[in-house]
């Protein structure tokens, strides 16, 4: 029962109306018997610092950070984990003993979760998009030992910055979505991962669209695994299209749960819940 002593954890982003995190996190908090609730708070770019400073002064125990704040929030944190610092992208914060924000990134572990048993070592992959989520995905693909990682984006400046971020750790190929070479890569890819918001179910985005338009996908073959980080709607228009082509498809739900478990552990100093607790809550809701 919520009381005057109840603390909260919040999801900060814009938009957040589509988020399923409150469903699964509140199920987990109830499972653990903690006097905590999880809420979603819409936050515009210009309000981010004000919101984070305000939350320091009330019963906030931690935050999830989502689009479009994963990179900007770096400057507002006093402690940053090695993985978050490397990726320059943050999705989880907690208040430390000095009432300052400590930050980490649980997206890499979440992203890998559905791929662990698919034997993708030495395979070819494409990442669509060049924002904060793409950084986590690329790190995950490096961890899985894929041989080729190509990044396709419509934003040249963020694409160049993304490739620079990984330096000499792996040879990344960057292309604009209008480049003819993209069709060759799509035809040969073993795995394609969408990190763009195209297809997300919100008032801000149309959910019946595909990343870069349907003609961009004309060379997709049935042997390719298509992984869309979007989890609402599930399946997305992209995954429906890919399934009709005969592709194996993966939506963002397993990643959402897996990263959520790691975030919860970060907020609670090591407590964990079984995967099924969050997953069952989502399935019941959906």
Swiss-Prot record:
Catalytic activity: shikimate + NADP(+) = 3-dehydroshikimate + NADPH + H(+)
Gene3D superfamilies referenced in this protein's UniProt entry, alphabetically: Leucine Dehydrogenase, chain A, domain 1, NAD(P)-binding Rossmann-like Domain
Pathway: Metabolic intermediate biosynthesis; chorismate biosynthesis; chorismate from D-erythrose 4-phosphate and phosphoenolpyruvate: step 4/7
Pfam families cross-referenced by the UniProt entry: SDH_C (PF18317), Shikimate_DH (PF01488), Shikimate_dh_N (PF08501)
Catalytic residues in the record: 70
Key words of the record: Amino-acid biosynthesis, Aromatic amino acid biosynthesis, NADP, Oxidoreductase
Top EC category: oxidoreductase
GO molecular function, one term: shikimate 3-dehydrogenase (NADP+) activity
GO annotation (BP), single: aromatic amino acid family biosynthetic process
Assigned EC number: 1.1.1.25
CC per GO annotation: cytosol
Binding-site positions, NADP(+): 129-133, 229, 252
Residue sites binding shikimate per the record: 19-21, 66, 91, 107, 231
Subunit structure comment from the entry: Homodimer.
Protein family membership: Belongs to the shikimate dehydrogenase family.
Protein function: Involved in the biosynthesis of the chorismate, which leads to the biosynthesis of aromatic amino acids. Catalyzes the reversible NADPH linked reduction of 3-dehydroshikimate (DHSA) to yield shikimate (SA).
Protein name according to UniProt: Shikimate dehydrogenase (NADP(+))
The organism of origin for this protein: Prochlorococcus marinus (strain AS9601)
Gene, per the UniProt record: aroE
